């Protein structure tokens, strides 16, 4: 998917032009303050490039799930304030995303100004990709930039619908980066390629495991999903999480890996607990010796070492999903060990593919050491699965 990008637009293309830019400002908020502004900062390179080239930037985003009606708690007021701070200039915030107020605010904009529209999901036409709503959103602008990778897997009015009314429609720098690393790792990786897949359920990672079996040399599995694989091997897993209806699938995935010559590694030891609780009693046991009534909540130290050795010669590593219940200190060591191993691998391309593994890496302060940290959860997974993302397909080809 080689798409036209903001970088290809010159000052003469943009000067005085009104640009509708879709960003992903769906940031975590607690007690009336933003707890992590990564997504806001991720949009800055595109916003700054547009304003420096003399464009009038009209920002749009969703926030939370207001289900098509106004929800006072889900207004973008805090986002507007933080944007003004990090951009070092006033960002005017509208109380709607379509209509008279928007039209008159945009009419007063000067070159280089930035305006933030209200939460697009206050209208059901956003998630319904209603052409009339998309047309109204687009009506105030001359061209379109999508830099919201986190929602690129959704065909919504602000990610897909508006492209029918605005030309050119191009990718921002964030989407360009995401495609370069994620698409690059799938289409033309430096080999050997390893994928580390974690998380609690096989069901949510089936697509990505199947797709990666066609691409990678090594597949390392961790997290709660491993117990479904152990059960498929006939092992006793105590009270560990098992998806009974996925046991046959686990067998077939192992068989497929063997058939394709992919090294598929599961942990050899696990940290088990007598209950799902931060204060639980714990012990480290071999996978053949999980006691009845106990549950596995992390990979063990021996497994972390085996995984580390397996990654030693890899030139590209994709990681999606934690190795254990890393939110609880007693079950965080496996995830921490993998994060540290990747941070130390300066001879390889390391891609942290969205979701909880990103949170773990950021918490440990290792983000800077990775080649790429994806801002998309579902979007990253779908791209790694080889699916086409509607928000990207809709953009102009190079």
From Swiss-Prot:
Its EC number is 2.7.2.3. Substrate binds at residues 24-26, 39, 62-65, 121, 154. PROSITE patterns: PGLYCERATE_KINASE. GO terms for molecular function: ADP binding; ATP binding; phosphoglycerate kinase activity. It is found in: Cytoplasm. Signal peptide: none annotated. GO terms for biological process: gluconeogenesis; glycolytic process. It catalyses: (2R)-3-phosphoglycerate + ATP = (2R)-3-phospho-glyceroyl phosphate + ADP. GO terms for cellular component: cytosol. InterPro entries: Phosphoglycerate_kinase, Phosphoglycerate_kinase_CS, Phosphoglycerate_kinase_N, Phosphoglycerate_kinase_sf. This is Phosphoglycerate kinase. It comes from Trichodesmium erythraeum (strain IMS101). The gene is pgk.
């Amino acid at each position: 998917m080689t798409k036209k990008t903001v970088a290809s637009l010159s000052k003469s293309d943009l000067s005085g032009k009104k640009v509708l830019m879709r960003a992903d400002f769906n940031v975590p908020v607690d007690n009336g303050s933003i707890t992590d502004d990564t997504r806001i900062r991720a949009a800055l390179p595109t916003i700054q490039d547009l304003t420096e080239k003399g464009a009038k930037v009209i920002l749009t985003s969703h926030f939370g799930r207001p289900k098509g009606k106004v929800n006072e708690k889900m207004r973008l007021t805090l986002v507007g304030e933080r944007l003004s701070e990090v951009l070092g200039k006033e960002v005017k915030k509208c109380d709607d995303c379509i209509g008279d107020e928007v039209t008159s605010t945009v009419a007063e904009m000067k070159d280089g100004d930035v305006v933030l529209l209200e939460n697009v999901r206050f209208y059901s036409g956003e998630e319904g990709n209603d052409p009339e709503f998309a047309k109204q959103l687009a009506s105030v602008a001359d061209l379109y930039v999508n830099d919201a990778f986190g929602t690129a897997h959704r065909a919504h009015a602000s990610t897909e619908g508006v492209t029918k009314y605005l030309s050119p429609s191009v990718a921002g720098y964030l989407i360009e980066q995401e495609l370069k690393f994620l698409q690059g790792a799938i289409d033309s990786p430096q080999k050997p390629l390893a994928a580390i897949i974690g998380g609690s359920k096989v069901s949510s990672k089936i697509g990505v495991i199947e797709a990666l079996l066609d691409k990678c040399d090594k597949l390392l599995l961790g997290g709660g999903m491993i117990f479904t694989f152990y059960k498929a091997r006939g092992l006793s897993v105590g009270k560990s999480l098992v998806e009974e209806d996925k046991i046959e699938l686990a067998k077939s995935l192992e068989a497929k890996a063997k058939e394709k010559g992919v090294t598929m590694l599961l942990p050899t030891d696990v940290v088990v607990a007598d209950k799902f609780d931060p204060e639980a009693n714990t012990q480290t046991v071999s996978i053949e010796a999980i006691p009845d009534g106990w549950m596995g909540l992390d990979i063990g130290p021996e497994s972390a070492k085996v995984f580390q050795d397996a990654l030693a010669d890899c030139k590209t590593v994709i990681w999606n999903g934690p190795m254990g219940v890393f939110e609880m200190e007693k079950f965080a060591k496996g995830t921490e060990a993998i994060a540290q191993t990747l941070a130390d691998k300066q001879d390889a391309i390391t891609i942290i593919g969205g979701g909880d593994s990103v949170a773990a890496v950021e918490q440990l302060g290792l983000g800077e050491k990775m080649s790429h940290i994806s801002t998309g959860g579902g979007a990253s997974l779908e791209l790694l699965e080889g699916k086409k993302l509607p928000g990207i397909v809709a953009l102009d080809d190079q």
